[in-house]
Amino acid sequence: NGKPSETPTHHPHLNTSSFEEELILYTTTMFTSRRSFFAMCGAIVFPGVSLGEIIRTPWQGEGPFYPDRIPEDTDNDLVKNGHSTIEAGGKILNLMGSLINSDSKPIKGMTVEIWQTDMNGVYRHMGSFGSKMRDDQFQGFGRSITDKNGHFSFRTIIPVEYPGRTPHIHLKLLNESENVLTTQLYIQGHPLNKKDFLFKQMTKAEQNINSMKLIKNNSTEYETSTILVV
C-alpha cells in the first residue's frame, strides 16, 4: 500500500502488432464472453467505425477537488483505505483500461490517477461539500502504472451524483511530472448526463468515448473498461 500499483500480472502479454486483435484477447479475459466485450465497445467506439479510426480522448477540466493532501495510501484499490480491513460503502466497480497513442500502440510506464467522491458525494478535500459525512474507509484517490501492453486497473466504487454534477470519475495521466491528459469518465445512459454542463460540452462522439458501460459480474460487484487515446 502507498505506492502506485502495476496492473495485475494475470493480464496476457501479447506480441501481436494488431491493436484490434490484442484488445479483443485482453478484454475477453476480463469479461465472461465475447458478447460482453463487444457490448462494452459500444461505450468506446462509435457504431460502424473501426478501432483504427478511434479519436483522441477529450480533455476535461480537473475541477476544484483534486486532493489538497495526497493520502499516504495511493494504490489502485480505493475501496480499502490504508491497512484497514473494512471496505468503503458503495457498489464496487472494477475499472480496467488500455492506454494507446494515435497509432494504436500501447504506452507503458505512465501513471494513471483517479479521484472521485465517496458514496455520500464527498471528496477527500477540505473544501468538499458535506465533509462531516465523509466515508473515511474510502481512499478517494489512487494510482496505477500502465504495463508493457498499456493496461491499468482500479478497484473503486460506482460514482454517485452530488449537487450540480452527474456521477463521474476524474482521471489524470502523467508522464513523470508532465500532465499528458486530464478527463472525466461518466456512466453510460445516466439520466443526469444530459443536464451536466461538462458532459454537454462534449460532442456525441466524445460522450461515447468517455462513457462507462457497467456490467454486473457477480451479486455485489460491477466492471467496466475504457480506452485512453493520447
Model-derived regions: residue spans:
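Short, 15-30-residue, compositionally biased linear elements
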Residues: 46-50
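N-terminal secretory signal peptides and thylakoid transit peptides that target proteins
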Residues: 23-45
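Beta-strand-dominated extracellular/periplasmic modules and repeats
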Residues: 51-213, 217-230
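N-terminal amphipathic/basic-hydrophobic helices that include classical n-h-c signal peptides
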Residues: 1-28
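Residue-level detector of alpha-helical hydrophobic segments embedded in or interacting with membranes
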Residues: 3-7, 42, 59
